[in-house]
């Protein structure tokens, strides 16, 4: 059953400016080591900004779906893709619900949509 939803949109040039100004300091505050490592496959700053903007949107969308950011940091939330490219979101804290994630980008914007589902043991 759907428990909650969250969505977010990020202006990619803003992330690019932040990357240019703060670099690793910004990345290390928001993203996991794995997310940062996976971004290195992109050769241009613009592609890295697009990659990080989608992940930032996903993290924000999850916090909105959860209803509160208390007790969780952006680094507790990790976004990765399976071998076919489907995005997934995991949370390092105990979180037993199923999380569905959709990411998209077009032009200057990246978006994310999160659905949190809970499964009842009563049928």
Curated annotation (Swiss-Prot):
One GO term (biological process): fatty acid biosynthetic process
The cellular component terms of Gene Ontology attached to this UniProt record, alphabetical and capped at eight, are: cytoplasm
| Catalytic activity entry | apo-[ACP] + CoA = holo-[ACP] + adenosine 3',5'-bisphosphate + H(+)
Q: What is its main location?
A: cytoplasm
- Which Pfam family name is an example for this entry? ACPS
* Classification via InterPro entries: 4-PPantetheinyl_Trfase_dom, 4-PPantetheinyl_Trfase_dom_sf, ACPS, Ppantetheine-prot_Trfase_dom
Note whether Magnesium occurs among the keywords: yes
The cofactors it requires, by name, are: Mg(2+)
**Under which EC number(s) is this enzyme classified?**
2.7.8.7
Q: Which UniProt keywords apply?
A: Cytoplasm, Fatty acid biosynthesis, Fatty acid metabolism, Lipid biosynthesis, Lipid metabolism, Magnesium, Metal-binding, Transferase
Q: Which domain of life is it from?
A: Bacteria
Q: List positions binding Mg(2+).
A: 8, 60
Membership in a protein family: Belongs to the P-Pant transferase superfamily. AcpS family.
Q: What does this protein do?
A: Transfers the 4'-phosphopantetheine moiety from coenzyme A to a Ser of acyl-carrier-protein.
- Entry-linked HAMAP family: AcpS (MF_00101)
Query: What NCBIfam families does UniProt report for this protein, alphabetically?
Result: acpS, pantethn_trn, PRK14659.1
**Protein's UniProt name:** Holo-[acyl-carrier-protein] synthase
Q: Which organism is it from?
A: Wolbachia pipientis wMel
The gene name on file is acpS
